Amino acid sequence: MGRKWANIVAKKTAKDGATSKIYAKFGVEIYVAAKQGEPDPELNTALKFVIDRAKQAQVPKHVIDKAIDKAKGNTDETFVEGRYEGFGPNGSMIIVDTLTSNVNRTAANVRTAYGKNGGNMGASGSVSYLFDKKGVIVFAGDDADSVFEQLLEADVDVDDVEAEEGTITVYTAPTDLHKGIQALRDNGVEEFQVTELEMIPQSEVVLEGDDLETFEKLIDALESDDDVQKVYHNVADF
C-alpha cells in the first residue's frame, strides 16, 4: 500500500506539473492556512503541514513563498471548503474536495464534469459513509513492528502499520496525523514520501475496458478544475 500512495503523488505531479495546476492548488491551500493563522510555519502547524505536502509534490520554493507573502499582505480573498460526492461507472464511487472563492461556479463545474464524463453527482453523504477518514504516513523502512511500538509509546492512535518493499505505511486516526509525524521525526525519520489525510474506501472495485477508460476521463475532468483540491475513489490499482 505504501508504494500505492507514493505512486499516486508521483503520478499527479507528473500529470499536473506541466500546466502548473498542482502549484496553483497548493498556492491556494498555503495562502488559506497562512491567512487563518500565523504566516510562519514554525508557529502555525496547519501551514507547516501544507508546506511539507507541497514539498513532497515538488512544488518550488518560490511558489510557496509567494503564497505566504500574499497572506501577509492586505488581500482579503475568502475561500470556502466544499465536498461533492458521486458515482462513476460500474460501482465506482468518488468524493471531490474543493477550496474555492466562488461556490456557485465550483458546484456547477463539478456537476458538469460528472455529467459529461459518465458519472452522476449524488447527495451529500451518499458516498462518504463507505469511506473512512485516516491519516496516511509513508516513508522508507522495513520494520513495521518497531514503528508501531514507537507510535504507541508516543500515545498516537494508530490503526495499522504496513511494510512492503522497503516502504512503511502508517494509518492513524485523522486527529493524530500531526502527532504521528512528530513522533516519527523524534525517532529519526527525516524524510516522508506521503503525509496526507485520506478518505480510504471500505472496499474497492475493479474496472476494465470501457468502464476504466470512462472512469479515467471522469477523474481527469474533476482533477483539472482549479478549485478541486483532492479526489478520492474506490477503484483498485488506479
UniProtKB/Swiss-Prot annotation:
Listed A to Z, the keywords are: Cytoplasm, DNA-binding, Transcription, Transcription regulation
Q: What is this protein called?
A: Probable transcriptional regulatory protein MGAS10750_Spy0264
Mark the transmembrane ranges.
Answer: none
Q: Which Pfam families does UniProt cross-reference here?
A: TACO1_YebC_N (PF20772), Transcrip_reg (PF01709)
List, in alphabetical order, the Gene Ontology terms for molecular function in this entry: DNA binding
Instruction: Please list the coiled coil stretches.
Output: none
What GO CC terms are in its UniProt record? cytosol
Q: Which organism is it from?
A: Streptococcus pyogenes serotype M4 (strain MGAS10750)
Compartments, as annotated in UniProt: Cytoplasm
Question: In the UniProt record, does the keyword Transcription regulation occur?
Answer: yes
Q: Where this protein primarily resides, as one coarse class?
A: cytoplasm
HAMAP family per UniProt: Transcrip_reg_TACO1, Transcrip_reg_TACO1_YeeN
**What biological processes does GO assign it?**
regulation of DNA-templated transcription
Keyword DNA-binding in annotation: yes
Question: Cross-referenced PANTHER family, in alphabetical order?
Answer: TRANSLATIONAL ACTIVATOR OF CYTOCHROME C OXIDASE 1
What family does the entry list? Answer: Belongs to the TACO1 family. YeeN subfamily.
